[in-house]
Amino acid sequence: MNKLQNIRGVAFDLDGTLVDSAPGLAAAVDMALYALELPVAGEERVITWIGNGADVLMERALTWARQERATLRKTMGKPPVDEDIPAEEQVRILRKLFDRYYGEVAEEGTFLFPHVADTLGALHASGLSLGLVTNKPTPFVAPLLESLDIAKYFSVVIGGDDVQNKKPHPEPLLLVASRLGMTPEQMLFVGDSRNDIQAAKAAGCPSVGLTYGYNYGEAIALSEPDVIYDSFNDLLPALGLPHSDNQEIKND
């Protein structure tokens, strides 16, 4: 907790931290797979692939779908499919399809986690500078924040296309700290996955790990963040602000 004593700003991950984006992401992934006549994955499986950006998401989806198709065909006594298109090209095609479909479903398939809006408002009102660091493709980020009515709280927003190296590399966190006018040690980073905690450690930022996110199905404690919270509004007392229980509930 001592690392939280001299905090001047807070930066946040997006997917799995501020928002439950799995419904929209899974829908877009499945529509893209279906368009290529590949097996669809479903939300529960897609959740385990989230966190490293859209290109890696496509690689994971394609690898699984090709293996699943091969297994299904073998079970039915059918020969394997000859892959005329290299995997790299299929990933590129899948990404184009995903971008098209995700643009259609992102807003309706994304929800704020409990306590996020009020807690961000309280942090902003306290004078703390707030930033956002996400591996999500940049074109989707600003419209999503606006649709959720939380864009107004962030002084700096860094998407996955804004840096050469995405999390877990420290580059995006160092960029946000610089733009907020503070040292990494003065900026708390809040996330839900090992990528987030690894990026914070590499950048020299204190970190909070949230237990309710995605994180590839593993406990956030394994990544050893400085602090672990079960609820987003636990940030308030940790930063010397009153803990409000009068918070909004996630709208499913």
Swiss-Prot record:
Annotated GO CC locations: cytosol
Taxonomic source organism: Salmonella paratyphi A (strain ATCC 9150 / SARB42)
InterPro entries in UniProt: HAD-like_hydrolase_sf, HAD-like_sf, HAD-SF_hydro_IA, HAD_2, HAD_sf, PGP-like_dom2, PGPase_prok
Listed name of the protein: Phosphoglycolate phosphatase
GO BP term, pick one: carbohydrate metabolic process
Enzyme Commission (EC) number: 3.1.3.18
Listed Gene3D superfamilies: HAD superfamily/HAD-like (3.40.50.1000), Putative phosphatase, domain 2 (1.10.150.240)
Physiological role: Specifically catalyzes the dephosphorylation of 2-phosphoglycolate. Is involved in the dissimilation of the intracellular 2-phosphoglycolate formed during the DNA repair of 3'-phosphoglycolate ends, a major class of DNA lesions induced by oxidative stress.
UniProt KW Amino-acid biosynthesis keyword: no
Entry's Gene Ontology molecular function annotations: metal ion binding; phosphoglycolate phosphatase activity
UniProt-annotated binding residues for Mg(2+): D13, D15, D192
PANTHER family the record matches: PHOSPHOGLYCOLATE PHOSPHATASE
Pathway linked to the protein: Organic acid metabolism; glycolate biosynthesis; glycolate from 2-phosphoglycolate: step 1/1
Keywords of this entry: Carbohydrate metabolism, Chloride, Hydrolase, Magnesium, Metal-binding
Complex formation: Monomer.
Swiss-Prot/TrEMBL catalytic activity: 2-phosphoglycolate + H2O = glycolate + phosphate
Cofactor(s) listed in the protein's UniProt record: Mg(2+); chloride
Class in the EC hierarchy, top level: hydrolase
Protein family (similarity comment): Belongs to the HAD-like hydrolase superfamily. CbbY/CbbZ/Gph/YieH family.
Residue numbers annotated as active site: D13 (nucleophile)
